[in-house]
């Protein structure tokens, strides 16, 4: 099964690093999320929306929180991606792990569950190319924002 995994060390505590994926203000500031609905509990919804206009919502990622351990891990199952130019893609899994280090926190992001076919190949390649830039964007954002 194909998966995408990237890690980066961030000079911030684990709880702040994980909050970058759960707090709307952080999501808005580093990832450009325009709307979110997140229930931080097992079985809770995790939904992010980008490119909102008066007529439509551009891109939506949504799933079910399978595990949430503050300052440690966020596991989202049944992750589905909506793109107006593509078929709905899912279900997948997204795992966000934080590991305390002497100099901060290692953030590891793993996205898995990619199927086969042209749209899946397109999405896998987009995500494979995007996550390295995304984790560096998180690092830059968090290391330049106050605790």
Can you describe what each PLM-predicted range is?
Residues 5-6, 25-60:
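Short beta-edge strand/loop motif at the mouth of beta-sheet-based domains
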Residues 22-23, 136:
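Solvent-exposed alpha-helix faces
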Residues 20-21, 68:
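Conserved catalytic core of Hanks-type protein kinase domains
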Residues 36-37, 56-104, 112:
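Hydrophobic-ligand binding "helix-grip"
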Residues 2-14, 52, 66, 99-108:
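Aromatic-glycine hotspot motif
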Residues 113-147:
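A conserved amphipathic terminal alpha-helix motif
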């Amino acid at each position: 099964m194909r998966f995408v995994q990237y890690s980066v060390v961030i000079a911030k505590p684990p709880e702040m690093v994980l909050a970058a994926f759960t707090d709307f203000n952080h999501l808005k500031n580093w990832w450009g999320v325009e709307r979110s609905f997140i229930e931080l509990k097992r079985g809770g919804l995790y939904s992010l929306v980008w490119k909102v206009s008066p007529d439509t919502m551009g891109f939506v990622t949504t799933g079910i929180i399978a595990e949430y351990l503050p300052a440690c891990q966020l596991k989202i199952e049944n992750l589905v991606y909506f793109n107006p130019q593509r078929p709905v893609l899912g279900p997948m899994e997204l795992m966000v792990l934080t590991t305390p280090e002497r100099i901060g926190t290692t953030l590891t992001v793993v996205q898995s569950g990619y199927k086969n076919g042209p749209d899946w190949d397109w999405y896998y390649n987009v995500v494979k190319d995007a996550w390295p830039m995304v984790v560096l964007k998180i690092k830059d954002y968090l290391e330049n924002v106050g605790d």
